[in-house]
């Protein structure tokens, strides 16, 4: 048996003592007393902050929402099926934040900014708080740059500016998502970063939107944040704030961003579910008292920054679903009062084949013509009034037996104006083509055509104008004004096309 020498033992002991690192740390620990329905109640955690992240022993994370005298109410960011009563919970000392970087462009992620498109991890060196304060009054400037949606009805009569918040509201299946996605498609080549947030949607619907973006080449400048209908309520509640944090990252880097929240009704329902399970007192329609603050703190983050901050912008298009056209319900009235206008989609118009089914009469943009180029103001200034008068006259005409010639002409013009506002999905128009289309309708060039021929004629006119009068587009894009020269070119193109069209009809 070999004998150990004293000096060897001494050397080993000395090495062990030198390697010993006495590190003492204090951790805020609690214990689970109740768990279920996406909620956990914890005793302990005396030093926790509101909104702080906590970590359970088996790895699930949660957010502290209710801080009570005897326990803490935690909402779980997962199913929590493996959490056991009596297990330990550790406070992390951090408020919820996500990584942010340019690498997120073209990706589909969840509310925790984790990729769900199977294309691998996203490398990011920076992070942002999911909930950060909105820009102050001093940090902002008034909205003055147009954000073109590519939809004639919106760009001519309900203009949206960069930094504006415009609500898209309507019943289910009226084309709300189509208006939002067409707006994203129209940002191609406009140097605008788009974020599409899907809250509580069917996975098949989100997949269809993503496929559409890929086919049209829009994913290059778009980030999709998706929490499906089967996701925990906590993640559905967080998804819009995650999207806003990503959009803010680009806004503060002097970029223009557009964010779609589809839709905030589902987020409010998820928040109501969480609040009721946390035993917060219910208010109107069983929503908690702070549901207005839920949406106001989200939508106030949209802004047009001043020149000192780089003039970046974040334009928000929240979507809210109504029941049977009832805009006086709790969530619709809340969001209407927060936003800078609303685009109202009508199921009656949709069923009548008028798509996009925008009710121009009760839709409004509180920014108004400040968000339009001068050429559009010159051409489309009276369109909304003419359509409103047409709708009024049409209602009257149902009861009148005979109408005078002026009223008949006004009705005929109104029907053609309504016809030119029709657009197929995923077919946004450049502003120059919109101006040509509206001018043709408002100046009476369509009056001689049958209503069924209007859209065919306008398609041919736009193609003819592009092929034979490229100077028209150059004048509008350079001067942003509908000059005399532009008007002469457009009149020539319309006359030529009318002659060609009448010949085609004869043959």
UniProtKB/Swiss-Prot annotation:
Keywords: ATP synthesis, ATP-binding, CF(1), Chloroplast, Hydrogen ion transport, Ion transport, Membrane, Nucleotide-binding, Plastid, Thylakoid, Translocase, Transport. Its main location: plastid. One of its GO terms (cellular component) is chloroplast thylakoid membrane. Its EC number is 7.1.2.2. One of its GO terms (molecular function) is ADP binding. The keyword ATP-binding applies. HAMAP family: ATP_synth_alpha_bact. NCBIfam families: atpA (TIGR00962), PRK13343.1 (NF009884). This is ATP synthase subunit alpha, chloroplastic. The gene is atpA.
